[in-house]
């Protein structure tokens, strides 16, 4: 890293940026996988925790809080239960990270060629929002598979990644791989815009602090992520509820997931049956996960990119990697 002197769009050539972004996604995903499984389980849980009478007809587990859910999954499904969906998730994060960072760099550089340059926060917001939309759309089927695997209990619906792709294609068609995609894009565009704008704004002042192991990047990533995640969380929950729709809906760990159709109608249904709190189920673990995930992602990205630049790894593009 340049000690805050360079912005993300000014660092490294295209191949170095893709490699660093993919590596950052891989490392980040493995570290936070258990929290991601917990978040998905809590988001898919529809019954009231404060009303014991609503639990009478429930056949699956009842999760209460992050630690309790971690213990329950570990007890009932073993240590591997905390990494369910990790294979499609690793593929997702590798592809997503590479596409996201390379798109961010390309869009930022393009915006800087405008006759009237945009203010840095505006440029960062637009670049982050568009890059997030591109990366989300490109990798969405992997995101859906990750959710479905994480939602499985001991009675598996899909035996492997290959089987899941085959079964969804056969029973749901191409549309099945994009259930909830509208909510995902509606969520990720403002999220990544807020995240990158916040990260760029915080990166320079935090980089001037004497922090161990060069953790200024991590600190900026944590703060930016918490702010952005809280703002768009209801759409993340809606996306998860829509991703498990279809013929397998009643076979997941939560067998009482209602039928949902469309983002707007899903939000209305959740508000009607669970109130505003229903849109924020899993927020606590989501924020707990978002902080280390973003910290690890940005720290890994900056340091891997710095290592690649020092090693002159990758092809220099456009006269030394200065352009796109």
UniProtKB/Swiss-Prot annotation:
Regions crossing the membrane: 15-35, 79-99, 125-145, 182-202, 218-238, 282-299
Domain of life: Eukaryota
SUPFAM superfamilies: Mitochondrial carrier
Residues in the signal sequence: none
Coiled coil, from the record: none
Example GO biological process: transmembrane transport
GO CC terms: mitochondrial inner membrane
Principal location listed in the UniProt entry: mitochondrion
Keywords, ordered alphabetically: Membrane, Mitochondrion, Mitochondrion inner membrane, Repeat, Transmembrane, Transmembrane helix, Transport
Keyword Transport on entry: yes
Cross-referenced Gene3D superfamilies: Mitochondrial carrier domain (1.50.40.10)
UniProt Solcar repeat ranges: 12-110, 119-205, 212-307
Subcellular location: Mitochondrion inner membrane
Topology within the bilayer: Multi-pass membrane protein
Function: Mitochondrial transporter that mediates uptake of thiamine pyrophosphate (ThPP) into mitochondria.
Family the entry assigns: Belongs to the mitochondrial carrier (TC 2.A.29) family.
Record-given protein name: Mitochondrial thiamine pyrophosphate carrier 1
Species whose genome carries this gene: Ajellomyces capsulatus (strain NAm1 / WU24)
Gene: TPC1
